[in-house]
Amino acid sequence: MCRGQSVDLGTREKFTAFEKHLKEFNPNLHFSDFSERGLNSFVAFLRDKLKMRNTTIAKQLGFLKWFLRWATAKGHNTTTDFQYFAPKLKTTGKKVIFLEWEELMRVFEYNVPENGTKVKLRAADGRCYEKVVSDAAALRKTRDIFCFCCFTSLRYSDAANLKCANIDGDAMTITTIKTADTLRIELNKYAKRILERYKAHWTNDGFVFPHLTNQRMNFYLKELCELCEINTPVTETYYRGVERVDETHPKFELMSTHAGRRTFICNALMMGISAEIVMKWTGHSDYKSMKPYIDVTNTAKAEAMRMFDER
């Protein structure tokens, strides 16, 4: 789907993936297959065949129930077991992946080498290795668009659809794609520096940044953060069925476009900016959605205070 269309591309991609999972489960599905027994079989397929986490399974069931409610309302479906189907799926809180300020500055200031350059890197365990730069132009675009999100709180979808007309001097006014909220966001010096890099090349269709799909952005963002040695080990805990799984990865492997907005929120709160003001920039309407970020910053504050004990 092209930019500028009203349907959220991210939502479209999620439902496309959901449709694929249904076809993999049973290419000849009928509504009658979604009895309680069939629903349990679908959950087992997602867990055992596709190796999904419980949190992901819950999202897939949410998509399925939405579709079955629609089909029931339209008279296509008469099997209503889904209305009462609520499997116990043990979950943990999702870890907030974001860049600390020093890490963000490392990415922001990174001078991407030319294609084919062999970059010497050091892993968190001290191991040295080389990585070849694959697409310098895409990495530079990724750096700038991602950092713009980190400095403005924009979701990637809103940064990708940002138009020159949205920029008004020291601020920008946008209507968000996901929630249709109209927000006025002041531009700090870092965001302005990024805009200056693109002013001479603003496209004829009015978009501020050159287009990269979310999928490509995520791919190049991991490579960019690896080149910047954003490799602190991060452990994630999740459940697959009743099995608890603990996985540790270097942070760059966990980076995605979602981390841009999270980076803005966490750093703003750690700078001492009140949650009320941050919410005016992000468009959050209640503290519940801000709580994971506040919890992260409270932990960071406690760790920072312990530095006094080490003096």
Residues covered by each model-derived region:
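Short, polar N-cap/turn motifs at the start of nucleic acid-interacting alpha helices
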Residues: A165-A171, L254, M271-P292
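Conserved tyrosine-mediated DNA breakage-rejoining catalytic core shared by Y-recombinases
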Residues: T152, N161-R197
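Basic, Lys/Arg- and aromatic-enriched nucleic-acid-binding interface segment
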Residues: N54, A58, N77-Y156, Q215
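Short, aromatic/basic-rich helix-turn unit that serves as a nucleic-acid recognition element
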Residues: M1-F18, K74
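Short, basic (Lys/Arg/His-rich) helix/loop patches that form interaction surfaces
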Residues: C128-A136, W202-T203, F207, K222-K280
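DNA/chromatin major-groove-contacting recognition/catalytic segments
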Residues: V107-Y110, E186-R193, R197-Y198, P292-R311
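A Lys/Arg-rich helix-loop hairpin that forms a DNA/phosphate-binding surface
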Residues: L9-E13, F25-A44
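Catalytic-site neighborhood detector that most strongly recognizes the C-terminal catalytic loop/helix
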Residues: T176-A180, N214-M217, T282-M307
